[in-house]
Amino acid sequence: MLSDNAFLRYQRQVCLPEIGESGQQKLCDASVLIIGCGGLGNSAALYLAAAGVGKLVLCDDDEVEISNLSRQIAFRNQHVSTPKVDALAQQLRALNPECHIRTVQRRVDRNLLPLEVAMSDVVLDCSDNLETRHLVNQVCFECQIPLISGAAIGWSGQVIAFDFSAPNKATGCYACMVPRDYSDQLGKCSDLGIIGPVVGTIGNLQALLAIQYLAELPEFKTHQLMTFDAKHLDWQKWQLMADPDCEICAAKEANTNNNEGVICPSL
C-alpha cells in the first residue's frame, strides 16, 4: 500500500491504467543494479529514481572529468575529480530522498558481480567496454536475472533487453549478437566522439524498459534490438536469433564445468 506521500509524488504514473497503484508499489519494492555511471547510467538512474524505484545500486570505478559534462547530465562543475558513483548518488538523493542508493566504487569482476546481480531484480548495463558487457551478460544469464544493455557512439545508439528469468531464456544473449573477438572492430567515444542527446535517448530507453519489466507490462519486449541513427532520426528494430554455437546460452552445462564460469549465489 502506497503511503500518502508516495501517492502524491507518483500520482501522474499511478493514474496510468497500465501502472496503477499496484504497479507503482512494484517499482517501490524493486532493486536495480546500474553498471556504469557515465552518460547512459546518468540518464537511466535519474529517471528510475524519479519514477520511484526503491533501490538503486551504482557501480563504477571512474571519476568525473570535465569532458564528461557535455553528456553526463547529472554532474556539475564541482563534481570534477569526484568519484562518479558519489556524485550521481548525491544528485539522486536530492531528486528523490525515498530512493535508497548504494554505491560500489570499483570495476566489476567475477568476484563482485554474481552477488550484486543476484540481489537485483533487473540489471542495466551502461558500461563502455565489451569486456564488461560480456561478463555482465554471462552473470545475468547464469543468475537468471533480466539484463537491459545499452550502447552509444558518434551519432548512433542501441538498446536491447534480455529476460533471462523467463522459461525460454535460451533464446539468445549479448554474446550471440556481439562475439567476444569483435572488440578490435569497435571504436571509443574518446576517439570517435559522441553527441550528448544520443546517450540520453538510449539511457532513457533503458529506464523505460526497466519500468516496463518491473511493473509487469505485457508490452515489454525481450530479445529485440533497437538501433537509433540520430543524424537522420531513424529507428530500426531487429529480432535477435540465438546462435546455436554461443559459448554462453547454447552450452549451459559446458559453462558450468568451465573454469571461466561464474557461480551465482543462492539468496
Residues covered by each model-derived region:
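Adenine nucleotide-associated cytosolic modules
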Residues: 1-267
